[in-house]
Amino acid sequence: MNYSDYFTNRPTDEITRDLVGRPLIYDNGKEKIGGYIVEAEAYMGKNDRTAHSYGGHRSPANEGLYRRGGTIYIYAQRQYFFFDVACQEENEPQGVLIRAIEPIWGIDTMIKNRSGKSGVLLTNGPAKMMQAFGIHDKNWNLHFLSDSPFKIDLEDDHRKPAQEIIADKRVGINQSDPVWANKKLRYYVAGNPYVSDMKKRNYAKNNGWA
């Protein structure tokens, strides 16, 4: 399946859930680094009060969401960067935020990029993941995935099966809007230690993989 079909032919929350367990790989020009996606959040577009495109808001900063599904949308908050992929057809501004990966490839390089931080602290959050990749800018914003150094492996036999995928509330959502704050649009591998804010007491055997 190609990226255009994968990121357009079903609801964004279904796409987000299906991404869990798939390899996300970044080619930094010297080596390929990355891991299995263990946590991702869906943002449902113009009606989602937590989305950057809520109410049809459109600006150069969030233009990536308005591009065709499979387009990279990188945004910044202070000095931190976040990796999203647009979903649905052009001008239907929905997307998925990749929140965390379990690192597999290029771990030594990722530790160096994270100034020596290792273990679960390496990639257990969206900004940490981007730091681990060595990304400190928006150079790849608005690029289509297949025209970038990023790859999400869509081969089903390369997807790592989880024992359970949890649907839960998204992280850091403003509680002043209880409807959207409580929608279960975050998907993660149950008990995986690389999921953001996963408590050690909840760590699962084999990191939650089947």
Swiss-Prot record:
The keyword DNA damage applies. Keywords: DNA damage, DNA repair, Hydrolase. Its EC number is 3.2.2.-. It is an enzyme of class 3 (hydrolase). The keyword DNA repair applies. GO terms for biological process: base-excision repair. One of its GO terms (molecular function) is DNA binding. This is Putative 3-methyladenine DNA glycosylase. It comes from Lactobacillus helveticus (strain DPC 4571).
